[in-house]
């Protein structure tokens, strides 16, 4: 399977970065063809300065990301949840990459996702307990329905570790979650 891993934390030394790398490494060992976009290290302006009415001066990175998305069968997003949403750099990636004509189009008043047939997984961390998002929805349901679902991508798996930087957050707590991520990558 062709897998694209998108690491969405702006911090190259973050736990989300570690999780994305663990998934990518394990998926390669399992025989998958893996590419990774590491937004913490990319030279990429995440600000959509003119909406979609005008192209920005440098479209090289978004065009490369679109090529990677078109290539992939499965996308894996790894990111922390901050203020009930993804980090700004990941939001900017979505804004500049999942553009009209590439990811979706409108036919009259109806939208059509153009990335149908692709699947995705979310690997997320949060300071809040995980059950809060299962109970109230929030960012996970938004990603499933209003981001991925809107462009035709089917969310097949969500791995979430809550209570990061809380009393239960120990090295063994995090290591157990890394192993869960590795097991998912193995299939």
What are the language-model segments listed below?
Residues 1-32, 37:
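N-terminal beta1-alpha1 ligand-phosphate binding loop
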Residues 10-11, 41, 127-128:
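Short, glycine/serine-rich, charged loops/turns that create anion-binding
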């Amino acid at each position: 399977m062709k897998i694209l891993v998108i690491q969405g934390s702006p911090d190259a030394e973050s736990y989300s970065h570690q999780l994305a790398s663990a998934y990518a490494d394990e998926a390669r060992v399992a025989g998958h063809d893996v590419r990774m976009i590491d937004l913490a290290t990319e030279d990429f302006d995440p600000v959509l300065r003119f909406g979609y009415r005008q192209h920005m001066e440098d479209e090289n990175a978004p065009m490369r990301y679109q090529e990677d998305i078109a290539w992939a069968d499965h996308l894996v997003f790894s990111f922390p949840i901050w203020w009930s949403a993804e980090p700004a750099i990941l939001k900017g990636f979505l804004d500049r990459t999942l553009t009209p004509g590439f990811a979706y189009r409108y036919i009259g008043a109806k939208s059509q996702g153009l990335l149908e047939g692709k699947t995705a997984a979310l690997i997320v961390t949060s300071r809040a307990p995980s059950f809060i998002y299962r109970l109230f929805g929030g960012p996970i349901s938004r990603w499933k329905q209003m981001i991925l679902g809107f462009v035709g991508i089917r969310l097949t798996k969500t791995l979430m570790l809550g209570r990061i930087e809380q009393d239960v957050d120990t090295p063994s707590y995090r290591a157990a979650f890394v192993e869960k991520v590795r097991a998912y990558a193995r299939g």
